[in-house]
Structures are given as C-alpha cells and as structure tokens.
Amino acid sequence: MYVILLDNNRTNILANPVQREILYCIRCGACLNVCPVYKNIGGHSYGTTYSVPIGSVITPNMNGLEEYKHLSYASSLCGACTEVCPVKINIHGLLLDNRHASVEQGMTTFSEKMAWKIWKLASLKRGLMNTGNGTLKSKVVNKLFKDWNKYHTPLEFSKKTFNEQWKERKHE
C-alpha cells in the first residue's frame, strides 16, 4: 500500500499566522456570489483552480506570489466577501496582506512605483488633477501602467474633469 500526501504548499501557509486563515475555506462559494469583480468578469479570466475572491488569496500562496500577485489586485476591496463568509475569513484583509508582501519583496517595477507616486501627488493637488484633457491623461496613465494593463483593460478618462462636470451640473 502506498500513501501519497499532496501538500501544495499548505504547510508553509499554515506556518504563516496571518495567511493560515485561508485554509479554513470550505469552498461554499458565498464570496463569489457577492463579489462585484466576479459578477463582471467571471472566474475563467483568472486562470486558476480557485475562483475569486478567495482564490485571489489562496493561489498566490500555493503557486507563488511572484507569478500570481496580480490576482491580489483584482479586487475592489469592498469587503462584501468577508461579510458573507460563513467561517469568517478576512478575505479583503488577506488580499491587502498579499499586496503588501509583493511590495515588500520587491516585486514591483520602478515604473509602477513612480506611477503610484505621481498618482498620489495628483490626487493630493486638485490643480494637477485638472491639468490636461481626458485623452492626454489616458495616454500618459496607460503608458505608466503598461504592466497593469496586461491583466486589465486600459484606463479611459472622461473628456471633462470632475470639476468641469460639477460646475455644469451646478448651473443646470
């Protein structure tokens, strides 16, 4: 008689006090039913055995964070999955933990880091956010986030800024 034990990196997950929680998953699918990302794009686009959102936590831990880190970014972090989970897994918290781990392990490119710094600066300074039209912003941002666009549709900005749209509505 032979006994084959298939671990699939579960021992390493069990050793991590934060990520251990994902092993409690009973694969009931409650998180899938409430996930807005899953509702819009389905599970096949993720290309893994475990579907989102719990699969976005499990897969990088089982099959390697470097190859599957993008799954942790495929979430709106609304928290609906955590609310409905019958075993109370903090799914959106674990997604954030995976994102943090990928940054800490240096898995982000220089251009990605710079793009987020520019985005932060523009978000903090309203004048910068209003500079340029939507077409120009779309081209610049999509160029900066070209790695992001491997897994997502390119970003497309509105032709008018939020402030312009707000002023138009205010005068109506």
PLM feature spans:
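Ferredoxin-type iron-sulfur electron-transfer modules in oxidoreductases and energy-metabolism complexes
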Residues: 1-22, 38-141
